[in-house]
Each structure stands twice: as C-alpha cells, then as structure tokens.
Amino acid sequence: MSTILTTENLSLFYGKKEALKGINIDFDDKGITALIGPSGCGKSTFLRCLNRMNDLIPNVTITGEVNFNGHNIYAPTTDTVQLRKEIGMVFQQPNPFPFSIYENVIYGLRLAGVHDKERLDAAVEKSLKQAAIWDEVKDRLHANALSLSGGQQQRVCIARVLAVEPDIILLDEATSALDPISSRMIEETLLNLRQDYTIITVTHNMQQASRISDRTAFFLNGELIEVNDTKQIFMNPVKQETNDYISGRFG
C-alpha cells in the first residue's frame, strides 16, 4: 500500500517545553489509524501538526518535516488554506456554524469560489449521504444546524469536511462528547469512509480504537512508542509501555 503522509523527526515546543520528541511515522493511503495514549501524551498536538493547526497557537516552535504527497507542508510556499482543504479536521465538540445545514455543508465550497447551484446541491447530497445523515435531514436542509442533536451536528461537521473532497480526515476525539448511540453511528460512518479516505483519529476509547482502526499508534510523554497493525498492538504489543497502557496499568 502506498504512503500518503510521513513525518520525519517531528518535534514541537511550547516555549522551551518539548511536547513532541522526534516523531517518525508513515500513514497509508486509505484506511484508519488510531492515535492512543494517556492525557497529555501529545497525540492531539501531533494530530494538529498534520494540517498546521498549531500555527494558530502563540509561542510554538516546530522542527522536522511533515510530507504530504511528497511535499513538506511546513515549507514557506505552502498554502495553508489549500492544505486544510486537502487535510480536513473534525473536532471534539461539534462545531456547526449558526446557519442552515445546507450552508454549513457548502461553506468550504463557497470559500473556494463555487457558486453553481447544481454543483452545490449535488455536493450537499453526496456529503450528507457519506456522513450517514442525509435521510434524517433531507427534508429540512434549510433548518439551523444548531437545532440538531449533538450526534447529528457532528455528522454535519463530517459532511462539511467531505464536501471539499479532502484526501485525509483528522478527528480529534470526535465522539467523546457524544452519547453511545451517536458514537456508534460516527464509528459506522468512519468504517464506510475508510475505503476512500485516509482517516487519522485521536481517541481515549480503547474499544473504539480496536473496533474501527487498521493501525494504531501509541504515544507516551511526547514520544511515539509503538505503531503497528491494530490487532498486533492490542494482542501482542512489542513494547512494555504499550502493554501496560493497553492492560490498564496506567492512563
């Protein structure tokens, strides 16, 4: 399988504090990778490095490279708006904009200068179907997205990312604020998307990681301890630290 994203000796500092320590990892083109580890281990910080969301935080220094389709995204010539279209992100708390479901989904397309109504209509239907929420909202596309339940809002946020046709979808604990039924629906959505997208998800939920991911990476104290096929990580990890975390000895 080909590689779509690679980090090389990636480190991040908040002031003088080193939060990520020389991370080297490859991500396959298509499929789901789960990033696991205890709170404060660096997994969410790492995730935000992958589409330069940490640029928005003051006093952050990043060294090393993140290569996306062979291009270092930290090169001065990188268009970060285009980058975040190609590598989209879904956050922990559902964050629909305070306007209609329809306008939420096409927000990125409008920013990109798309105004053709047929194209926008088609993108809305396709994206909402991919996010497994079309049947629930197709008759009220012009209702305010904030009127939806938390789980529905999160699927609209996924549809908003999908509408601009990204290559990679990043999810930062995208189900942790949801009830179990809504979480399961998001999981099923991700499983349906894994054939067409590279999905990288941060999760504290060990069962979720084992259910949905193809590969799992374990972070601890800013270091990547181990990355492997998910079955291997959960059934026969190589590193003692991984085994201790998986078996609940800390975290």
UniProtKB/Swiss-Prot annotation:
Keywords: ATP-binding, Cell membrane, Membrane, Nucleotide-binding, Phosphate transport, Translocase, Transport. Its main location: membrane. CDD domains: ABC_PstB_phosphate_transporter. Disulfide bonds: none annotated. The complex is composed of two ATP-binding proteins (PstB), two transmembrane proteins (PstC and PstA) and a solute-binding protein (PstS). NCBIfam families: 3a0107s01c2 (TIGR00972). This is Phosphate import ATP-binding protein PstB 2.
